[in-house]
A protein has these predicted regions:
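Vicinal oxygen chelate
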Residues: 2-13, 32-33, 40-43, 48-53, 57-81, 99-104, ...
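Amphipathic alpha-helical segments
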Residues: 15-30, 77, 81-83
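Active-site-proximal flexible loops/turns
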Residues: 19, 61, 112
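Short active-site-proximal "capping" loops at secondary-structure junctions
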Residues: 38-39, 57
Length: 118
């Protein structure tokens, strides 16, 4: 039986250095420019690494995959991400303490930050 482990989540970007720097700040990570301008990693204390690869033509349309994060204090994290330049694009409240906020990063990649619910 094979057991898969998430090693890295990779983002396409016209400017991987800039986007990696933004995400490093957002997730308290460290930038490792493997091939500056072409491929950059963000190393994190926990969880998968984030990769940023140069792609000159972004994929048009809505993201088919996005990253979900949790935060102990959702409102505080929303304020922090907005101050870094994230753009809030939506909110959901499913009841039972399960709610999340949808954002776009500086390249327009969707990601969510939410609570785990009760």
């Amino acid at each position: 039986m094979t057991s898969l482990t998430v090693e890295m989540i990779t983002f396409d970007s016209a400017d991987p250095d800039r986007l990696a720097a933004w995400w490093a700040e957002a997730v308290d990570g460290t930038v490792n420019a493997v091939a500056p301008g072409e491929f950059v990693l963000v190393l994190r204390p926990q969880g998968p690494r984030l990769g940023f690869q140069r792609v000159d033509a972004p994929t048009p349309g809505k993201n088919r995959v996005h990253v979900d994060f949790t935060a102990p204090d959702l409102d505080q994290e929303v304020d922090r991400l907005l101050s870094l330049g994230a753009v809030e694009t939506g909110r959901q409240d499913m009841g039972g303490g399960f709610r999340w906020v949808v954002f776009a990063d500086p390249d327009g990649n969707a990601f969510c930050v939410g609570t785990g619910g009760d």
